[in-house]
Amino acid sequence: MVFEIPEPYQWDETFEVFYEKLDEEHKGLFKGIKDLSDSPACSETLEKLVKLIEDHFTDEEEMMKSKSYEDLDSHKKIHSDFVETLKGVKAPVSEENIKMAKEWLVNHIKGTDFKYKGKL
């Protein structure tokens, strides 16, 4: 299923997973992608986004592991594939790559992360 990309591109309550730390981190990821969209030529902004994403994925995966979440391995693979894709992107970042990142985050939260609601 493909979910609608919000405009303006920002987190709202429809993305809530009901774990405060993860919701706050998701808000930061939306902001990081928006910042990159606003400054696609800035390699520093791209590097900050990659770091934010890696840190969030680590936190999320640690929560999953601590609760023996059954889909941890497949979730980690989805994360690592996205990080690998992002690390292949260079500044200036194309509109196509910004769109890809926006769509990936929205679809990942609503299509994949929502599966762990109430399980962590």
Curated annotation (Swiss-Prot):
It holds the Pfam family Hemerythrin. Keywords: Cytoplasm, Iron, Metal-binding, Oxygen transport, Transport. One of its GO terms (molecular function) is oxygen carrier activity. CDD domains: Hemerythrin (cd12107). It is found in: Cytoplasm. Gene3D superfamilies: Hemerythrin-like (1.20.120.50). It comes from the Eukaryota. SUPFAM superfamilies: Hemerythrin-like. Signal peptide: none annotated. Transmembrane segments: none annotated. One of its GO terms (cellular component) is cytoplasm. The keyword RNA-binding does not apply. Fe cation 1 binds at residues 26, 56, 60, 113. Fe cation 2 binds at residues 60, 75, 79, 108, 113. Belongs to the hemerythrin family. Monomer. Myohemerythrin is an oxygen-binding protein found in the retractor muscles of certain worms. The oxygen-binding site contains two iron atoms. This is Myohemerythrin.
